[in-house]
């Protein structure tokens, strides 16, 4: 148990040490006027929240309709599809949104197909980011892009992203090549 606590503390402090300090985080509950800017496939990443251990690493979800996110938020919940307004309602959270530069109509159709195929899984931290047996928030988001790009033989997607990592943290998604930050202000 002592080693598990030490491991969690080390992961907590190292999981996002290389994040660009200039990244423009937007207060989550103030971007109501940005809802029209979201598109299917946009990745939403919430900042870390130190008071809640479930949020120590941040949180990630993906837009699955123009007004709804899809996510695996916590143990016992499985897949949840929720209104983005409700998802952003937390007062003390900040958000960054990312968009894949090559998200065209063909990619979108296959992406939504993969969303539907991966809805009925259980939440579980897995050390195989390529597995679709279980999902956790950021691995689910990454896996959707990985699977869709693989299905379409997309040469623009970095299949070797975090190649040697067993876990994809929410903040890791901020480093995905060919994704741009969406201005939410």
Q: Each PLM stretch: what is its role?
A:
Residues 2-9:
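Sec-dependent signal peptide recognition
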Residues 17-23, 127-185:
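Activation targets extended, charge/polar-rich intrinsically disordered C-terminal tails
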Residues 38-42, 58, 108-112, 138, ...:
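Extracytoplasmic/secreted envelope proteins and their assembly/folding machinery
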Residues 49, 116-120, 142-150:
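Sec-exported extracytoplasmic/periplasmic mature domains
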């Amino acid at each position: 148990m002592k080693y598990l606590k030490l491991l969690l503390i080390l992961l907590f402090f190292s999981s996002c040490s290389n994040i660009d300090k200039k990244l423009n985080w937007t207060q989550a509950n103030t971007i109501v006027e940005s809802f029209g800017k979201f598109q299917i496939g946009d990745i939403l990443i919430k900042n870390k929240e130190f008071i809640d251990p479930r949020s120590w690493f941040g949180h990630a979800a993906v837009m699955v309709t123009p007004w709804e996110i899809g996510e695996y938020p916590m143990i016992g919940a499985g897949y949840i599809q929720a209104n983005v307004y409700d998802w952003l309602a937390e007062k003390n959270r900040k958000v960054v949104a990312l968009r894949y530069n090559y998200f065209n109509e063909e990619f979108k159709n296959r992406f939504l197909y993969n969303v539907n195929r991966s809805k009925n899984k259980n939440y579980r931290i897995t050390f195989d980011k390529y597995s679709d047996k279980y999902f956790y928030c950021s691995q689910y988001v990454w896996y959707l892009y990985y699977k869709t790009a693989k299905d379409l033989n997309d040469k623009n997607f970095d299949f070797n992203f975090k190649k040697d990592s067993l876990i994809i943290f929410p903040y890791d998604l901020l480093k995905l090549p060919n994704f741009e930050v969406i201005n939410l202000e």
